[in-house]
């Protein structure tokens, strides 16, 4: 497996554009799992390398992961490796697509694509109020958007972002603005789980 991880790193550094693009998509997808404290499996890395090398498609990678976890179910309810692997593969596939529309419906669709079969509420706006203790805030409790106003709040934030002009902004200003927009989406917390996509 370490050879596959080295191969994965090599692809990011020295391959042709198509392989490099897939490599970055997989690297990003795996990294996003780590942000949520999830660890992907060695099997996922092996599958990713096969996809990057052109041996299998994203659809085949997803099918292989599905079969792998049907044959090797988690023995511990706390083990979220299957979730990490499946979501990482779906993120890599989404990042490799060229079509995208910046709308609340697309946002809901992305959640549905990533979490179908993992969360029963995949792609659906939550219909209940929540508070959560967040590790990123040292366990402080966060109040999220009210369930009755989630759709309207989401549409408002997207419409405000669409109006914003990035013209003549420095990279630091762009990063700051995007961070504020993303933090607003997280504060809305439109889904019961899976909001940090």
What residues fall within each predicted segment?
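FIC/Doc superfamily catalytic core
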Residues: 1-197
């Amino acid at each position: 497996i370490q050879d596959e991880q080295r191969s994965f790193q090599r692809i990011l550094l020295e391959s042709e554009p198509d392989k490099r693009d897939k490599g970055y998509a997989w690297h990003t997808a795996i990294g996003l799992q780590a942000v949520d404290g999830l660890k992907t499996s060695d099997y996922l890395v092996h599958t990713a390398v096969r996809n990057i090398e052109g041996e299998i498609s994203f659809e085949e990678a997803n099918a292989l992961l599905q079969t792998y976890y049907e044959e090797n179910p988690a023995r511990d309810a706390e083990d979220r490796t299957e979730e990490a692997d499946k979501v990482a593969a779906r993120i890599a596939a989404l990042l490799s697509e060229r079509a995208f529309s910046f709308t609340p419906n697309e946002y809901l669709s992305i959640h549905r694509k990533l979490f179908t079969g993992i969360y029963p509420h995949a792609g659906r706006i939550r219909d209940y109020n929540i508070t959560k203790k967040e590790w990123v805030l040292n366990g402080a409790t966060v109040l999220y958007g009210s369930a009755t106003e989630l759709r309207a709040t989401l549409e408002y934030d997207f419409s405000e972002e669409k109006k914003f002009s990035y013209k003549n902004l420095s990279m630091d200003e762009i990063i700051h603005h995007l961070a504020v927009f993303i933090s607003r989406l997280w504060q809305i917390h439109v889904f019961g789980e899976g909001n940090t996509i």
